[in-house]
UniProtKB/Swiss-Prot annotation:
GO terms for biological process: 'de novo' NAD biosynthetic process from L-aspartate. Its EC number is 1.4.3.16, 1.5.99.-. One of its GO terms (molecular function) is flavin adenine dinucleotide binding. Optimum pH is 8.0. It comes from Escherichia coli (strain K12). Signal peptide: none annotated. The chemistry is similar to that of typical amino acid oxidases in which the transfer of the hydride from C2 of L-aspartate to FAD is rate-limiting and occurs in a concerted manner with respect to deprotonation of the alpha-amine. NadB may have structurally evolved from succinate dehydrogenase/fumarate reductase-type enzymes to gain the new functionality of oxidizing amino acids while retaining the ability to reduce fumarate. Its cofactor is FAD. FAD binds at residues 16-19, 38, 45-52, 161-162, 223, 375, 391-392. This is L-aspartate oxidase.
């Protein structure tokens, strides 16, 4: 029997990072918006982003140059239209962020005029990265959170996970297949609630938690990708998971990122004996794209049997380092490492999901009323490798374009008054929570070993066999026991793990972030790896 939902709104946004909150603020003057946040509202990847946002603000730079740099970094399979769409709208979307109160670093030019301080990162041919010292994400997130919490038309539900999307045909509604809301796990009450919405937006971030080592916060469990797949959406390019080259190697800070901007400002990568190695791998040295740098570090670690490599900027003046990287300097100092005096131990770690749910220029998915923006989506911008500081930019541009489309379509959106409640009549409390913990550790370990920086066909086949066994265990557990946060995340992440492996098995070449010893060369013609629910297939 259908009942009135516990929550109802015009637009439900699942995720509270730069993508979700920028969209919420653009919509809220005209629409009622609910934002779901899995943890505290600031606990997402945006808050921890150090580098900055790429946009053309320098008169010596150009949109064409930004486009070409992105296409080169994407290793030949970016969607040129998407790249041009993002680059051409970058400045206006960054200006909107500035208008919201975000403070980027400035400096005084030789002519006495003040301008934004632009830094350069790997893959960029010009200085075009706007930043707030070395904590850009924190500045962006805290500004947007403050605006959202004070807007009368935005409700932020913290500690609330989406369990699954409610799709019309699965609950017996007639007409075109569309999304009508979501079931939501209230972590405070430990109950599943119903939320009706005329439009639903996935802004859930990526899936790097599928790997043992990651720079991401604990919530990056691929929820949006898995829910969209179950709802009937296509996904693409999930074999391209970016491994950030420089995560801190330290037992007390295993997911701490050392920003690309350090290398942009002259830091060197060194072996334990103090010698540089990046010039041996790429003429751009430390400023090569991330996939090349990560593989080089991985290669040197395995060749030397070393636990880590080192990042060294101690040749720069100490005042320069403290001024440009105050957060990193203080963090490392607290761990007994002086960035101004010594090299920092680093390893690669899973950082960014370049593929995701297939969308158009407005973030629309294959299901009517369902949008996906930010890291959860596949727009074609990143291709086989994301260029530094294009990720926050993608969040802003598609937050704007999705808002335009949602507003345009809202007068014609379907409205319903009742939805089926969550059915717990045939489940009981879990009796063996240790099973979930064991499955967590097993999944993340074999994904790191078999589907990491370097892959083989045999490793992928082994991973898929283990994923299939885990899925059977998890599905049985999900069917018989009440949901929990760990169970929901594990169910989603093992689904995304399968999609990652299936995409990787499709690609019979090494391109960008996907490197396999069995197919080390590039194919002459290639394109995105696309999976469709019900029948896995390649569309290139």
């Amino acid at each position: 029997m259908n009942t009135l939902p516990e929550h109802s709104c015009d637009v439900l946004i699942i995720g509270s990072g730069a993508a979700g909150l920028s969209l919420a603020l653009r919509l809220a003057d005209q629409h009622q918006v609910i934002v779901l946040s899995k943890g505290p509202v600031t606990e997402g990847s945006t808050f921890y982003a150090q580098g900055g946002i790429a946009a053309v603000f320098d008169e010596t730079d150009s949109i064409d140059s930004h486009v070409e740099d992105t296409l080169i970094a994407g290793a030949g399979i970016c969607d040129r239209h998407a790249v041009e769409f993002v680059a051409s709208n970058a400045r206006s979307c960054v200006q909107w962020l500035i208008d919201q109160g975000v403070l980027f670093d400035t400096h005084i030019q030789p002519n006495g005029e003040e301008s934004y301080h632009l830094t350069r990162e790997g893959g960029h041919s010009h200085r075009r990265i706007l930043h707030a010292a070395d904590a850009t994400g924190r500045e962006v997130e805290t500004t947007l959170v403050s605006k959202a919490l004070n807007h009368p038309n935005i409700r932020v539900l913290e500690r609330s996970n989406a369990v699954d999307l409610i799709v019309s045909d699965k609950i017996g509604l007639p007409g075109t297949r569309r999304v009508v809301g979501a079931w939501v796990w209230n972590r405070n009450k430990e109950t599943v609630e119903t939320c009706h919405a005329k439009a639903v937006v996935l802004a859930t971030g990526g899936a790097s938690k599928v790997y043992q080592y990651t720079t991401n916060p604990d919530i990056s469990s691929g929820d949006g990708i898995a829910m969209a797949w179950r709802a009937g959406c296509r996904v693409a390019n999930l074999e391209f998971n970016q491994f950030h080259p420089t995560a801190l190697y330290h037992p007390q800070a295993r997911n701490f990122l050392l920003t690309e901007a350090l290398r942009g400002e002259g830091a060197y990568l060194k072996r334990p004996d103090g010698t540089r190695f990046m010039p041996d791998f790429d003429e751009r040295g430390e400023l090569a794209p991330r996939d090349i740098v990560a593989r080089a570090i991985d290669h040197e670690m395995k060749r030397l049997g070393a636990d880590c490599m080192f990042l060294d900027i101690s040749h720069k003046p100490a005042d320069f380092i403290r001024q440009h990287f105050p957060m990193i300097y203080e963090k490392l100092l607290g761990l007994g490492i002086d960035l101004t005096q010594e090299p920092v131990p680093i390893v690669p770690a899973a950082h960014y999901t370049c593929g995701g749910v297939m969308v158009d220029d407005h973030g629309r998915t294959d299901v009517e009323g369902l949008y996906a923006i930010g890291e959860v989506s596949y727009t074609g911008l990143h291709g086989a490798n994301r260029m530094a500081s294009n990720s926050l930019l993608e969040c802003l541009v598609y937050g704007w374009s999705a808002a335009e489309d949602i507003t345009r379509r809202m007068p014609y959106a379907h409205d319903i008054s009742t939805l089926p409640p969550w059915d717990e009549s045939r489940v009981e409390n879990p009796d063996e929570r240790v099973v979930i913990q064991h499955n967590w550790h097993e999944l993340r370990l074999f994904m790191w070993d078999y589907v990491g920086i370097v892959r083989t066909t045999k490793r992928l086949e082994r991973a898929l066999r283990r994923i299939t066994m885990l899925q059977q265990e998890i599905d049985e557990y999900y069917a018989h026991f009440r949901v929990s946060n760990n169970l929901l995340e594990l169910r989603n992440l093992v689904q995304v793990a399968e999609l990652i492996v299936r995409c990787a098995m499709m690609r019979k070449e090494s391109r960008g972030l996907h490197f396999t010893l069995d197919y080390p060369e590039l194919l002459t013609h290639s394109g995105p790896s696309i999976l469709s629910p019900g029948n896995h297939y390649i569309n290139r």
